[in-house]
């Protein structure tokens, strides 16, 4: 009967493990996948001995190496949630076995501790900056405890056999050689665990400390406690070896934060990732279905609209729109803003500022490594025609798993024996070359309006840059600058379509300057909009005109400028 109850109890416990694993996979696959995509894009793993040796620069090199190696597979659908779930399960299993090896009393104590640890790891993983290597560090700390415990058990059994074989035990055995060996093992294990698994050493220390407390009255326990405390203090001596502060020394590769699922941020990452993947229709659907999209969602939505030629038609679609043209990079600029601005300059055509923003985004990534930005640097130099620099970045990408195939194709496209497909890959970047900034890019400030003017002067048919320029003027309600830019750049295009937004803005300017009828006839080409303008003047501020620039001009607040 007792065995049957035990069997039923074990079945119930392991059923919880299975259900928990399924729940974890389902959540991260169907409700939280873009956090994992974001992590994959913000790291870089190269199959190169020179690169792999850089992991020795910080404690926990084995956990970081294994974590970054596995993180690169987050790029593939289903792979990320599977890897994360398995790593959490393995960590829970290691902790459970380690608690049992620590001989802590309680039949279900090991399972309870394992469940608590796995729940904590899932909660930590809700944060976008919690890396997989931190989970592996915990698993590694428990593994070191298990291995060292088994080695000590074997050593003690060996010493007992020697004592039984010897009728006159040696003096060393009489003094308790086993206790000294245990103390020495703990000291060595602390240093080894810290070297391999970083902050996983705290898991090892907690297991040793708890095991000692549960057997505090046994002989030799205080030797073990002393052997545990001393090396933790001696770890401070490795500060100069790793060139890091004490906090990093004891917490690397990172301690998690208890956060609830960041579903709003998940939508932001969804828009960011789908734009990166080229799924522009998904970007539009996500943003339009969101009740209150944040500034980053609006930013990518506008990028898509601008590339389709619909930016003026959708500028007033949100109460407070975000074009990104008022942002300036500085010490207080949010990390997400830094990582998105390169997309703006890429679309506008300014490769110099695109490269600058990309470099800064790379610097702001963990360990200054970002595979998405390395690929963008290769693309920038393809557009610029700097093939020597292009090859440098392509050689880096050739050593990755995800982008090696693309890098090989791009590398071959630069050669004389390029295939048709390889030439087509290069051609899409060559077609972007006429839109780059041909003006002197050395300037004292980062004025996006100046950049857009230079782009329009470099290529009068750069409609995207002109639309962004005019729309930025209108968001600021700077009618004088808008009129000047309209005359200088918009009217010089080959095909002028007289968008409704610009016509409405011109009516405000002409009415404000009391222009003559000849001026009205010169600029106002759409009589249907002019009739509605007369109606608005009779019902000024009426909600029925909320889709017009006239209403925005009267009611909306001017966006605050970033002056970093």
What residue spans do the PLM features occupy?
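Internal/C-terminal transmembrane anchor helices
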Residues: 224-242, 257-260
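Membrane-interface coil-to-helix junctions
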Residues: 26-85
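Transmembrane-helix signature of polytopic, membrane-embedded enzymes
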Residues: 99-119, 158-159
């Amino acid at each position: 009967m007792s065995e049957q109850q035990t069997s039923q109890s074990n079945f119930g416990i392991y059923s919880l493990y299975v259900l928990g694993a399924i729940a974890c996979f389902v959540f991260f696959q169907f409700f939280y996948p873009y956090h994992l995509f974001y992590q994959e894009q913000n790291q870089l793993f190269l199959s190169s001995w020179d690169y792999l040796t850089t992991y020795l620069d910080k404690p926990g090199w084995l956990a970081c190496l294994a974590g970054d190696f596995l993180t690169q597979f987050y790029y593939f659908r289903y792979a990320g949630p599977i890897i994360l779930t398995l790593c959490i399960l393995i960590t829970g299993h290691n902790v459970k076995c380690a608690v049992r090896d620590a001989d802590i009393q309680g039949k279900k104590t090991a399972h309870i501790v394992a469940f608590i640890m796995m729940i904590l790891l899932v909660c930590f993983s809700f944060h976008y900056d919690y890396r997989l290597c931190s989970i592996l560090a915990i698993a590694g700390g428990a593994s070191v405890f298990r291995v060292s415990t088994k080695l000590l058990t074997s050593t003690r059994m060996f010493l007992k056999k020697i004592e039984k074989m010897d009728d006159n035990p040696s003096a060393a055995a009489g003094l308790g050689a086993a206790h000294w060996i245990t103390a020495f093992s703990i000291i060595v294990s602390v240093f080894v665990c810290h070297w391999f698994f970083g902050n996983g050493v705290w898991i090892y220390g907690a297991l040793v400390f708890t095991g000692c407390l549960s057997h505090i009255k046994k002989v030799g326990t205080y030797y073990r406690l002393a052997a545990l405390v001393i090396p933790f203090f001696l770890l401070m001596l490795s500060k100069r070896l790793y060139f890091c502060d004490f906090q990093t020394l004891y917490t690397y590769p990172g301690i998690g934060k208890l956060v609830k699922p960041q579903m709003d941020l998940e939508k932001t990452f969804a828009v960011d990732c789908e734009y990166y993947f080229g799924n522009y229709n998904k970007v539009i659907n996500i943003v339009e279905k969101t009740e209150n999209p944040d500034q980053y969602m609006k930013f990518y939505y506008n990028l898509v609209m601008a590339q389709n030629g619909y930016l003026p038609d959708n500028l007033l679609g949100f109460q407070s729109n975000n074009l990104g043209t008022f942002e300036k990079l500085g010490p207080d600029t949010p990390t997400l803003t830094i990582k998105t601005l390169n997309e703006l300059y890429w679309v506008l055509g300014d490769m110099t500022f695109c490269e600058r923003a990309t470099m800064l985004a790379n610097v702001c990534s963990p360990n200054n490594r970002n595979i998405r930005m390395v690929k963008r640097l290769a693309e920038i130099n393809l557009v610029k025609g700097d093939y020597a620099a292009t090859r440098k970045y392509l050689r880096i990408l050739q050593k990755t798993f995800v982008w090696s195939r693309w890098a090989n194709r791009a590398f071959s496209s630069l050669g004389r024996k390029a295939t048709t497909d390889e030439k087509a890959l290069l051609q899409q970047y060559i077609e972007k070359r006429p839109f780059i900034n041909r003006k002197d890019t050395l300037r004292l400030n980062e004025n996006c309006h100046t950049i857009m003017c230079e782009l329009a002067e470099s290529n009068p048919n750069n409609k995207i840059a002109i639309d962004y320029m005019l729309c930025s003027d209108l968001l600021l309600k700077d009618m004088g600058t808008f009129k000047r830019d309209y005359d200088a750049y918009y009217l010089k295009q080959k095909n002028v379509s007289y968008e409704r937004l610009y016509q409405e803005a011109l009516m405000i300017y002409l009415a404000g300057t009391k222009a003559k009828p000849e001026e009205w006839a010169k600029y106002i080409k759409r009589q249907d909009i002019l009739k509605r303008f007369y109606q608005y003047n009779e019902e000024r501020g009426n909600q029925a005109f909320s889709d017009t620039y006239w209403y925005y001009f009267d009611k909306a607040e001017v966006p605050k400028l970033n002056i970093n």
